[in-house]
Amino acid sequence: MNVYLRKLFPHDLTHEVSITRKIIELFFNNQTKDLRFVRKGCVNGRVYDVIINDATDPRFGGEFKEIYKEDLAKQGDILIIKEREDGCYELSVAFEGTLIHDRIKGVFEGTERHAIVDILLLGNY
């Protein structure tokens, strides 16, 4: 099973988060509407409605930023998104300085911010 990793840059904290067409194709199976997200470990059961806008270039819209802002994500943290069996996408944040962040940060070189990796790379996340 693959997960999508998205490294956060300053712009992502104030604007919509960009995504590539390749990620949309390979990870989201070209689905851009009616995406349902949940926060990993969230017990209130809230489901966030997300879309992928494509006015100039693809960007997450809808309630996407609300998900990771509740976790107080910041520049340099990495979003981890995986698809659950029920079709929802589960989002968690790998915070800088944590074991999981240290394990996965090496997949990004320079200003790269998108990666799809095998979930086995994450270990017991």
Feature-to-residue mapping (PLM):
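Acidic, low-complexity intrinsically disordered regions
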Residues: 1-125
